[in-house]
Regions:
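Short, non-helical or kinked segments that cap or interrupt transmembrane helices
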Residues: 23-43, 57, 87-91, 162-165, ...
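Inter-helical junctions in multi-pass inner-membrane proteins, predominant
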Residues: 1-7, 13, 157-161, 188-227, ...
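Transmembrane helix-bundle core of multi-pass membrane transporters
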Residues: 83, 89-159, 186, 256, ...
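Single transmembrane alpha-helix segments in multi-pass membrane proteins
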Residues: 1-52, 78-88, 92, 231-235
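Short loop segments and helix-boundary regions at transmembrane helix junctions
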Residues: 26-31, 60-63, 70-115, 159, ...
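Cytosolic-side transmembrane-helix boundaries in multi-pass membrane proteins
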Residues: 111, 171-178, 182-185, 256-286
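Loop-to-helix entry region at the N-terminal start of transmembrane alpha-helices
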Residues: 2-13, 56-57, 130-151, 209-211, ...
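Helix-loop-helix "hairpin" substructures at the membrane interface of multi-pass membrane proteins
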Residues: 134-211, 237-240
Length: 286
């Protein structure tokens, strides 16, 4: 049963990374690698609120989500929006996003150091036991957060006005403006929501495991792989791909050791990019 719990935990983290990354991609139509920063910022924000402000874990999590959402929106307005206004290609936006990620990742390392830090010690964390399996309270939060985000994003994409506006902006931003859609408002909301979800993932991972300056990309990469395998425009298949990827990843760790999990992820990513290299520089809407 513990293997099932481990799979659920890994799948929840992958789902959150995949769906938050997807939200930006389907609207802005480029690979936003700087989204990994939101995961790192969320982890360090939770650590800072927990240690410096003596906030309880619940408020540390909420504060990290709010702060990361604001930071992601600000980075879009300052760095990416001017490039998009000038008609920058998806490749240019990808390179700019990668540069932003590297600059701020090293900035985090300069401020907090390279060493891994623990937000919440395991000795202080409540642990629940179910038929021989164990889940910490943070792991329960992570699973609940992933389920909630998946349901809300699925319903929003299918039934809400914002979901229809998002699809219109993704299809043709200029035509959307003609029809009265505030494109900038939609894009800001997308980056706000995606960054907040990424920050929540970082905060929960930091409470459950540890934080480090490069943690964002380590957690984003499996999400990107699940997104590509499941299909960018089908949320339910992204969730299914995340569960399948987590299951195989757990099996790899169990039988071969944790050192092989990254090799597995990179192998799947390489195979997909080998078959569809155009995905990195823009893809046609299905």
């Amino acid at each position: 049963l513990q293997l099932v719990f481990n799979t659920l935990i890994a799948a929840s983290a992958i789902v959150l990374a995949a769906l938050s990354f997807r939200l930006v991609y389907v609207t802005a139509r480029f690979f936003h690698f700087a989204h990994a920063l939101t995961i790192s910022i969320g982890g360090y924000a939770a650590w800072s609120f927990f240690n410096y402000c003596a906030a309880n874990p619940y408020w540390a999590f909420l504060s990290a989500v709010i702060l990361t959402g604001a930071a992601g929106t600000l980075s879009f307005m300052v760095f990416l929006r001017p490039l998009m206004t000038k008609g920058a290609s998806p490749l240019v936006l990808l390179l700019a996003s990668l540069a932003i990620h590297l600059i701020f990742q090293h900035t985090i390392a300069l401020i907090f150091g390279e060493d891994a830090r623990s937000v919440w010690s395991l000795e202080q964390m409540p642990v629940y036991s179910f038929a021989g399996g164990h889940l910490t309270v943070v792991q329960c939060w992570l699973i609940a957060f992933a389920v909630g985000v998946s349901v809300l994003m699925g319903c929003s994409a299918s039934f809400s006005i914002f979901g229809k506006q998002q699809a219109a902006v993704a299809e043709h931003s200029e035509l959307s403006t003609i029809f009265g859609i505030d494109v900038l408002s939609v894009q800001m909301k997308v980056f706000l929501i995606a960054s907040a979800v990424g920050g929540g993932l970082g905060a929960l991972v930091g409470m459950d495991l540890s934080i480090s300056p490069g943690m964002g990309f380590d957690w984003l990469l499996p999400g990107v792989v699940a997104l590509l395998v499941g299909g960018i425009y089908r949320i339910r298949y992204v969730v299914l791909a995340s569960v399948m990827l987590a299951s195989v990843r757990t099996a790899v760790i169990w039988y071969l050791g944790s050192m092989w999990q990254d090799i597995f992820i990179y192998s799947v990513l390489f195979l997909y990019l080998f078959l569809r290299p155009e995905i990195l520089v823009g893809d046609e809407m299905q």
